[in-house]
Structures are given as structure tokens and as C-alpha cells.
């Protein structure tokens, strides 16, 4: 039954694109409650128990999602610090998405920052994405900036010869990295059907794939499993036939649309057997905090509230 539902979603993308713009019983109109949640001067910080697929094995670690609203200058594409320039800024949802996990003797640390307009999402695309990955061999950095209302200017810097330093343009319908923010702002805006999608900057780095738009099937259904828990869970899935990869995001269909977890399945390198492996993350803790002021030794107790090691 679930397979049939997925198939209908792909074949009838135009129908579902129309569906996402109407008042469906699947969604709750909650602009006021969302405003009350997001504009209280605090960030939402969630910790996830992470099982990261890497080098043909599963490595345990932590993932963090830090969601916060802030004023963002559209001309410089930076956080507004001076109120004199407020007329040049709009309000955005910022996500700092962190993954930390050890592989053998050395650690991986990755963070992606995503800046998405809130009120003007239909007229403004995701404005900026940055990604950095550090491990003992070296580190890489990627940045995408929305330009001229039609393209992304992309820059990538890498220690690795195969990657090198690059400066290029991207044209695409959507960026995978912005999907997380779309869910939190308004899941009715999620793309459905066959779309052109730029795979995530982290996946591009870990897989040494070029950052470019490829075809993906975007599916939405009510979650029917029991591995993830939450209120009125929905399952959003991106399937990339070219990469034999899929990403599933599980989120609550009640404001503020909390993300309960995700699964990412793809093939291990051929020299590690080439078998499919799955990264899994499950939300364990969430707090609301002005984390930017919590830098004293006495604030380390907040790490325990997040399920993080001292």
C-alpha cells in the first residue's frame, strides 16, 4: 500500500504541488503559535543519537540541530549586527547542523549553516549555505550564495587533490540542505514529485561528488513505522537514482514541526564492498536557550541537559 502511495506521488507531482498550496487536513494553520515559538529570543537546540555510515562501517556519535531566527543582510549575506543597516536585512531561519563522530583513531567534525527567508520564502530562495568538514587528514570548506535571483555562486576549498579549489555557478530547483528549514518554516512548501535537487554539501564532500543538480523523486507520507516516535509523524523522502541514495526525514505534523530523526542510505565505497549502508539519527534531547551567552564554566551543566559529554 505504501509503495502504491509513493508511486502516485511521483506520477502525479503536479497534483501534489497544487495540494501543498491548499489547506489540507494534513497540516495545521499555526502562524501565530509559530511566531510565539521562534521569536522569544532563544534558539532551539536538539541533540540526536547518531550512527554514521563511513568507510563501510557504522560509527556512533552526536548530531546537533541549532535552529534560530535572526536578521540577515541580503546585500552582504551576513548576520545584521548594526541596527543602522536594518533596512537592508530580512528575517531568516538559521540552522547550524553539526555532526561529530570518531572513525578509528581520528574524529570527524562537520557543520552546515543554512540561511532561509521566513516570511518571503516564495519570493526569496535560500540565501546562503556554508559547510566545513574537519578530520585529521585535512579540512574542506564550501559556500553557496544566492545571486541575481536566478543562480548560486559556489566556492569550494579542499586539502584533497581530487577536490581542489573551485569557483562555479549552480542553477537548480532546490537544495537538499534547505529542506530542513522548509520543514520548520512551513512543510506545505516541501517540493514533491520529480525535481532537480543539489545534493547536500556534506554528502558531496564525504562521497567526493561534484556539487550539481541531479534528478530526485520527492515523496511524502504519513509515517507508519515504529523506530521513530512523535506526534503525527510524517515521512519525507528524497530518492536519487543516479547515486543509489535516499534520504528520509521524520518530522511532527504539529507546530513547531520538530524533526524527530533522519535516515540516509547509500553505497559504501567499492573498496569497502560497495554494499548499501544507512546513517541513522534519532532525537534524544531538546532545549530552548540563548546559547550565545552560555560560555562560562557554570554553563557546562547545559550539556548534560542536551545529553552531551562534559
Question: What feature does the model see in each segment?
Answer:
Residues 25-148, 192-310:
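Acidic, serine/threonine-rich low-complexity disordered tracts
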Residues 147-192:
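Surface-exposed beta-loop interaction hotspot
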Amino acid at each position: 500500500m505504501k509503495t502504491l502511495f509513493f508511486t502516485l506521488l511521483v506520477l502525479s507531482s503536479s497534483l501534489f504541488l497544487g495540494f501543498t498550496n491548499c489547506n489540507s487536513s494534513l497540516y495545521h494553520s499555526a502562524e501565530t503559535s509559530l511566531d510565539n515559538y521562534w521569536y522569544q529570543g532563544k534558539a532551539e537546540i536538539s541533540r540526536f543519537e547518531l550512527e554514521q555510515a563511513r568507510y563501510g562501517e557504522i560509527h556512533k556519535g552526536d548530531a546537533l540541530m541549532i535552529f534560530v531566527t535572526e536578521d540577515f543582510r541580503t546585500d552582504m549575506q551576513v548576520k545584521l549586527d548594526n541596527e543602522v543597516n536594518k533596512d537592508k536585512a530580512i528575517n531568516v531561519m538559521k540552522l547550524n547542523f553539526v555532526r561529530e563522530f570518531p572513525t578509528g583513531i581520528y574524529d570527524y567534525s562537520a557543520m552546515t549553516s543554512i540561511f532561509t527567508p521566513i516570511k518571503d520564502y516564495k519570493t526569496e530562495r535560500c540565501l546562503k549555505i556554508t559547510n566545513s568538514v574537519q578530520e585529521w587528514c585535512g579540512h574542506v570548506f564550501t559556500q553557496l550564495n544566492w545571486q541575481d535571483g536566478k543562480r548560486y555562486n559556489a566556492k569550494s576549498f579542499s586539502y584533497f587533490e581530487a577536490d581542489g579549489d573551485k569557483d562555479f555557478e549552480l542553477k537548480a530547483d532546490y537544495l537538499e540542505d534547505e529542506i530542513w528549514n522548509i520543514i520548520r518554516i512551513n512543510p506545505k512548501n516541501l517540493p514533491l514529485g520529480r525535481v532537480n535537487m543539489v545534493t547536500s554539501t556534506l554528502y558531496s564532500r564525504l562521497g567526493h561528488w561534484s556539487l550539481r543538480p541531479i534528478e530526485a523523486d520527492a515523496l511524502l507520507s504519513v509515517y507508519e513505522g515504529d523506530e521513530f516516535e512523535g506526534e503525527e509523524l510524517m515521512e519525507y523522502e528524497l530518492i536519487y537514482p543516479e547515486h543509489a541514495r535516499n534520504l528520509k526525514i521524520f518530522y511532527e505534523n504539529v507546530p513547531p514541526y520538530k524533526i524527530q530523526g533522519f535516515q540516509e542510505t547509500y553505497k559504501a565505497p567499492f573498496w569497502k564492498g560497495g554494499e548499501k549502508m544507512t546513517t541513522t539519527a534519532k532525537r534524544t534531547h531538546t532545549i530552548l536557550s540563548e546559547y550565545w551567552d552560555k560560555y562560562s564554566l557554570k554553563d557546562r551543566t547545559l550539556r548534560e541537559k542536551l545529553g552531551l559529554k562534559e
